[in-house]
Amino acid sequence: MSQRFNFDPSFLQPDSIEKATIIQKELANRICLEDEFNTPEFFGGMDVSNNLFDPKQIIYATAILLDSKMLSVQFHNSVSQRQTFPYIPGFLGFREAPALIDALESLPKLPDMIFVDGQGISHPRRLGIASHIGVLVNIPTIGVAKNILFGEPKKDLGSCVGDYVFLYAYGKEIGALVRTKLRCKPLIISTGHRVSLRTAIEYVLNCVKGYRLPEPTRQAHLAANAFRKQSQAGN
């Protein structure tokens, strides 16, 4: 499947939910929860656009590359793929990661850190899509999700931009609710791979430019939607 990345493609192609669960547990054991990277020169952003009711089950995936200082988009690449794995909460990586990794692989340069639209370890089996991708491609990743999938905060979140509270499960920190824009719902930030939670929060807040989403996932979201609309208009 991949020329740049050395991983077993079966980690993305389970033939049953039971096998998918086993894969998630195996990959979760490989996650690094500490900072294991040099200062990033380029950020990556990943998101998909699709219609769950599309009978063709086509997914439109985008990976972008941004300059880490100016947060300007340097390159972007989008791919479309027909999906065979069903939409099941908690198993998003098997549905979306294959297309996202293909989009990432075709960038002229790989990012030093990737912001993924979705959960990292804030997941029932500690392997959301950000962690799934991070472990397979071995690039530091951060999960940037819009809704809580797993875990609960122990206190209320403040109303100021930059406020955050941790999410807990089984007595451990697994993520954080982070206020990135006034009068907007917080984001759920979590470690994907090779980035600690507190560092992930810091990088997300540094990448916010007046919007709810940090620029890497915001720009990927815009590009994925534009690609889907353009592709569907041509059919």
Swiss-Prot record:
<dbReference type="GO" id="GO:0005737">
    <property type="term" value="C:cytoplasm"/>
</dbReference>
<keyword id="KW-0234">DNA repair</keyword>
<keyword id="KW-0255">Endonuclease</keyword>
<protein>
    <recommendedName>
        <fullName>Endonuclease V</fullName>
        <ecNumber>3.1.21.7</ecNumber>
    </recommendedName>
</protein>
<comment type="function">
    <text>DNA repair enzyme involved in the repair of deaminated bases. Selectively cleaves double-stranded DNA at the second phosphodiester bond 3' to a deoxyinosine leaving behind the intact lesion on the nicked DNA.</text>
</comment>
<dbReference type="Pfam" id="PF04493">
    <property type="entry name" value="Endonuclease_5"/>
</dbReference>
<feature type="site" description="Interaction with target DNA">
    <location>
        <position position="87"/>
    </location>
</feature>
<dbReference type="GO" id="GO:0016891">
    <property type="term" value="F:RNA endonuclease activity, producing 5'-phosphomonoesters"/>
</dbReference>
<keyword id="KW-0227">DNA damage</keyword>
<feature type="binding site">
    <location>
        <position position="117"/>
    </location>
    <ligand>
        <name>Mg(2+)</name>
    </ligand>
</feature>
<keyword id="KW-0460">Magnesium</keyword>
<dbReference type="GO" id="GO:0006281">
    <property type="term" value="P:DNA repair"/>
</dbReference>
<dbReference type="GO" id="GO:0043737">
    <property type="term" value="F:deoxyribonuclease V activity"/>
</dbReference>
<feature type="binding site">
    <location>
        <position position="47"/>
    </location>
    <ligand>
        <name>Mg(2+)</name>
    </ligand>
</feature>
<keyword id="KW-0963">Cytoplasm</keyword>
<dbReference type="GO" id="GO:0000287">
    <property type="term" value="F:magnesium ion binding"/>
</dbReference>
<dbReference type="GO" id="GO:0003727">
    <property type="term" value="F:single-stranded RNA binding"/>
</dbReference>
<keyword id="KW-0479">Metal-binding</keyword>
<dbReference type="InterPro" id="IPR007581">
    <property type="entry name" value="Endonuclease-V"/>
</dbReference>
<keyword id="KW-0540">Nuclease</keyword>
<keyword id="KW-0378">Hydrolase</keyword>
<comment type="similarity">
    <text>Belongs to the endonuclease V family.</text>
</comment>
